[in-house]
């Protein structure tokens, strides 16, 4: 009997143990990442040929203590390699692990190689050659602290390499993991199996091979025992012949069918080729179609199983599309696949929540470095009185109500951008803004006391409901997470897409960017203030400080201002402001753009203006500004500087976003200024619920 080890992906160890025991293995012991077992030579070949779950079959050769590189050399050389190697066999060494002595895996591999080669040289035998690409023997050495374990890898290449797949494309899951997913799905061979996002077809091919009793190793051309001196070719050929006979019989007797679809025609063609190479191409129907076109191929029965490894996203901007995909899949399953089972394997359990289905079972497994989950569902049969499930029903109803009211108002006003929802319901803590036929969801970061998993699932429900109510495609929904911004983080860049959208606001055309920054380039709550500035600007010299993207300057210019001066510290936003001005035919010397620290520029400027708009940050401590600024503390000093630039009879429109801001009327009076609060006049219906979003004042000489 041989002591052996079968490695596998973490989470599949118990499944592998059961498989090995069915093959005849004895003494099976599960450890993390694999199973120790015992078996004769025939079992070695059977496990290599038939294991669908093992990554490699390893034959341990010995262990040694390693306190120096000499210990490693002598420990490896103590093994009788001349009884392991066939004459002329090539080899490669795979070394993993480090300790205080062996600090480099390449150095460790070199010492092992030297020890093996010298073992032959000392016996005056031809030294074996190293072949790193396709060796006859693979020697594995694992160093754990002071112990080195030496073994022969009888697999050669990993056992997931079945020999049927085109290796040119990326594979989201290995064949061994795909086989485990099929086994855990609850699918019964002989019943239909469908994968609506099949990619290169791995799940379906592994299922078809399992169902037709086709050994996973049948198509492999190279093994790790080809240079092994103890290899028994007779037994191997018997094992191989048995596998071929069973495969022919299984294919001839199998009567059910498999269905695969994907939106990418190229991967579907690859899937067809893979299935043909696997010898089961006639059993699988592959089609080019996306999940939106998914339908039950057997509406009159029998019931089957839908299985898939749907895509998941690592970037925030990919989530709306993925949530929509999962939500659509869930609805399609309930509408068309009553009585069927569903099994999905995902690296994003939160996305599976968008199915709006309750899982009967779930399993955990590793897909490379990713922690994944497989969830199995049973789809209830639909009845005449079945009601369609709703997602985030309270939120959806409120959004629908707001849309009905605000859409009509916006159309009458001639605006395309407005706030549709602003945390109206505390449990749905987001803002939803419309920009033409686009929508932006801003999630207000939940407090630390809220369970992160629940908050994420709630957000996914919000996205699914928003897409449904607004009837927009997922690629026109942008998701952002908004946290309390401080100082220089206020305009932090989020992306590099550089995609601008042209929108209308009354008689102005403006550019917005929905993806690259936390804000879009247009503060929606200041919409009425901008219109008022346009109405006040005719024939006047207009100054716009802390101008952002210059939208107020556009309205002033369109309102007939004699000149506009737009000042901001950011080159990016000034260039954006210039684009906005040009879009509205406003260019030339009458429309100046100045890049400067606004407070510093204000103190040094000696020009005169009839109308000044200033919307400073609540607080700023930018490195590029000479000093910190606090709007509550410093607004009187700010007005003193502004008064110096204000012509007789001129007006300052002053706005800020500080909640609880208190205007120092006495301080203004000492400067000879009066202030009239116009906050309520500047709040439009879409911000009626949030009356503290900004405060706004008209300031004039007394």
UniProtKB/Swiss-Prot annotation:
Gene3D superfamilies: 3.30.2130.30, RNA methyltransferase domain (HRMD) like (3.30.750.80), Vaccinia Virus protein VP39 (3.40.50.150). GO terms for molecular function: 23S rRNA (guanine(2445)-N(2))-methyltransferase activity; RNA binding; rRNA (guanine-N7-)-methyltransferase activity. Keywords: Cytoplasm, Methyltransferase, RNA-binding, rRNA processing, S-adenosyl-L-methionine, Transferase. It is an enzyme of class 2 (transferase). Its EC number is 2.1.1.173, 2.1.1.264. Disulfide bonds: none annotated. InterPro entries: 23SrRNA_methyltr_KL, DNA_methylase_N6_adenine_CS, RlmKL-like_Mtase, RlmKL-like_Mtase_CS, RlmL_1st, SAM-dep_methyl-trfase, SAM-dependent_MTases_sf, THUMP_dom. It is found in: Cytoplasm. The keyword Cytoplasm applies. Residues 43-154 form the THUMP domain. It catalyses: guanosine(2445) in 23S rRNA + S-adenosyl-L-methionine = N(2)-methylguanosine(2445) in 23S rRNA + S-adenosyl-L-homocysteine + H(+); guanosine(2069) in 23S rRNA + S-adenosyl-L-methionine = N(2)-methylguanosine(2069) in 23S rRNA + S-adenosyl-L-homocysteine + H(+). Its main location: cytoplasm. Specifically methylates the guanine in position 2445 (m2G2445) and the guanine in position 2069 (m7G2069) of 23S rRNA. Belongs to the methyltransferase superfamily. RlmKL family. This is Ribosomal RNA large subunit methyltransferase K/L. It comes from Salmonella choleraesuis (strain SC-B67). The gene is rlmL.
């Amino acid at each position: 009997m041989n002591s052996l080890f079968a490695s596998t992906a973490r989470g599949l160890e118990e499944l592998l143990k059961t498989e090995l025991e069915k093959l005849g293995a004895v003494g099976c012991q599960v450890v993390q990442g694999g199973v120790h077992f015992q078996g004769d030579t025939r079992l070695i070949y059977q496990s290599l040929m038939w294991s669908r779950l093992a990554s490699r079959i390893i034959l341990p050769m010995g262990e040694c203590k390693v306190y120096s590189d000499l210990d490693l050399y002598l420990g490896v050389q103590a093994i009788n390699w001349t009884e392991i190697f066939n004459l002329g066999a090539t080899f490669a060494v795979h070394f993993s692990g480090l300790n205080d002595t062996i600090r480099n895996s390449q150095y460790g591999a070199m010492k092992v190689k030297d020890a093996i080669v010298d073992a032959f040289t000392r016996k005056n035998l031809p030294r074996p050659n190293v072949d790193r690409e396709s060796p006859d023997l693979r020697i594995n050495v694992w160093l754990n602290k002071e112990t080195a374990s030496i073994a022969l890898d009888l697999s050669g290449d990993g056992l997931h390499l079945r020999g049927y797949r085109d290796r040119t494309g990326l594979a989201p899951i290995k064949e061994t993991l795909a086989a485990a997913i099929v086994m855990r799905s609850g699918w019964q061979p002989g019943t239909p199996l469908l994968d609506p996002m099949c990619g290169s077809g791995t799940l379906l091919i592994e299922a078809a091979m399992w169902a037709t009793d086709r050994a996973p190793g049948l198509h492999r051309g190279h093994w790790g025992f080809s240079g092994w001196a103890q290899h028994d070719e007779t037994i191997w050929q018997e094992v191989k012949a048995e596998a071929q006979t069973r495969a022919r019989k299984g294919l001839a007797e199998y009567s059910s069918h498999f269905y695969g679809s994907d939106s990418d025609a190229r991967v579907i063609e690859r899937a067809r080729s893979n299935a043909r190479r696997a010898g089961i191409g006639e059993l699988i129907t592959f089609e080019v179609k996306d999940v939106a076109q998914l339908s039950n191929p057997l509406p009159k029965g029998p019931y089957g199983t839908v299985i898939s490894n749907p895509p998941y996203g690592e970037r925030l901007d990919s989530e709306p599309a993925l949530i929509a995909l999962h939500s659509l899949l869930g609805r399609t399953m309930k509408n068309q696949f009553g009585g069927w089972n569903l099994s999905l394997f995902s690296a994003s359990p939160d996305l599976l929540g968008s199915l709006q289905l309750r899982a009967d079972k779930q399993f955990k497994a590793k897909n490379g470095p990713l922690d994944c989950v497989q969830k199995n569902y049973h789809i209830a049969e639909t009845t005449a009185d079945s009601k369609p499930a709703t997602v985030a029903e309270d939120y959806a109803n409120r959004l629908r109500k707001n849309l009905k009211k605000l859409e009509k108002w916006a159309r009458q006003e001639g605006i395309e951008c407005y706030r549709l929802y602003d945390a109206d319901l505390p449990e749905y803590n987001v803002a939803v803004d419309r920009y033409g036929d686009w929508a932006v969801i801003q999630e207000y970061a939940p407090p630390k006391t809220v369970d992160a998993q629940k908050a994420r699932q709630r957000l996914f429900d919000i996205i699914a409901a928003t897409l449904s109510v607004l009837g927009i495609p997922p690629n026109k929904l942008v998701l952002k997470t908004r946290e309390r911004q401080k100082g220089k983080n206020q305009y932090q860049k989020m992306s590099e897409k550089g995609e601008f959208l042209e929108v209308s606001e009354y008689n102005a055309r403006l550019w917005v960017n929905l993806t690259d920054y936390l804000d879009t380039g247009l503060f929606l709550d200041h919409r009425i203030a901008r219109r008022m500035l346009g109405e006040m600007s005719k024939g006047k010299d207009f100054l716009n400080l802390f101008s952002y993207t210059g939208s107020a300057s556009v309205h002033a210019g369109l309102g007939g201002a004699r000149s506009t001066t737009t000042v901001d510290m950011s080159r990016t936003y000034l260039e954006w402001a210039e684009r906005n001005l040009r879009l509205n035919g406003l260019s030339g010397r009458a429309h100046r753009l100045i890049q400067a620290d606004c407070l510093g520029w204000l103190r040094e400027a000696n020009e005169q203006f009839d109308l000044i708009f200033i919307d400073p940050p609540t607080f700023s401590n930018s490195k590029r500004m000479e000093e910190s600024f606090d709007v509550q503390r410093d607004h009187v000093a700010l007005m003193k500087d502004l008064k110096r630039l204000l012509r007789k009879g001129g007006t300052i429109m002053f706005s800020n976003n500080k909640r609880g801001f208190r205007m120092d009327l006495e301080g203004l009076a000492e400067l000879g200024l009066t202030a009239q609060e116009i906050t309520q006049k500047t709040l439009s219906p879409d911000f009626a619920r949030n009356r503290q979003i900004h405060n706004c004042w008209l300031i004039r000489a007394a």
